[in-house]
Design a protein with these regions (language model features):
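Beta-hairpin "wing" of winged helix-turn-helix
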Residues: 63-73, 80
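N-terminal helix-turn-helix DNA-binding core of bacterial DNA-binding proteins
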Residues: 10-54, 76-85
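Hydrophobic alpha-helical membrane-insertion segments
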Residues: 32-36, 67, 92
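Alpha-helical residues within the helix-turn-helix
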Residues: 46, 57, 63-64
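Amphipathic alpha-helical dimerization/coiled-coil segments
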Residues: 1-14, 86-116
Length: 116
C-alpha cells in the first residue's frame, strides 16, 4: 500500500493481468470443469466443445497466471486447479449481478403501468 492507503501501480498491473486471464468465458468454463478433478486437454476439449489447440491455449494462460497446475504422466499432461479462490471471486460477482438485476426489475416495475 502507498502512504495514502492506495495500491501501488505495479500491484494494480499484476491484478489487472489476472483479471484479464479470467475475462474469457472459455477459461472460466475450463476452471469450472477442473473443480471436479484433474483433466487432460482431450478431456477438457470433449467437455467444452472447444478444439484441443484452443483448450491448450487457454490452459497455458491459466497456468502462467497460477490458476492451474499440471503434471505429466506418461504421454499425458493432467491439469488441476491451483487455487479455489477464483470461485470466491465468482460468487462475489454473481451476488452483485443478482443485486443489479433486482434493482433493474424494481426500477422497471416502478415506471410501468399496472397490467390492464
Amino acid at each position: 500500500m502507498t502512504p495514502g492507503g492506495r495500491l501501488p501501480p505495479e500491484l494494480l498491473e499484476l491484478i489487472a493481468e489476472r483479471f484479464k486471464a479470467l475475462a474469457e468465458p472459455a477459461r472460466l468454463q475450463i476452471l469450472d470443469i477442473l473443480r471436479e478433478g484433474e483433466r487432460t486437454v482431450a478431456d477438457l476439449a470433449a467437455q467444452t466443445g472447444l478444439g484441443p489447440a484452443n483448450v491448450s491455449k487457454h490452459l497455458r494462460m491459466l497456468y502462467l497466471m497460477g490458476f492451474v497446475t499440471r503434471r505429466k504422466a506418461g504421454p499425458n499432461i493432467y491439469y488441476r486447479l491451483a487455487d479455489e479462490g477464483v470461485f470466491q471471486l465468482c460468487a462475489i460477482v454473481c451476488e452483485r449481478l443478482r443485486d443489479a438485476i433486482r434493482r433493474q426489475q424494481e426500477a422497471v416495475e416502478g415506471i410501468l403501468p399496472p397490467q390492464i
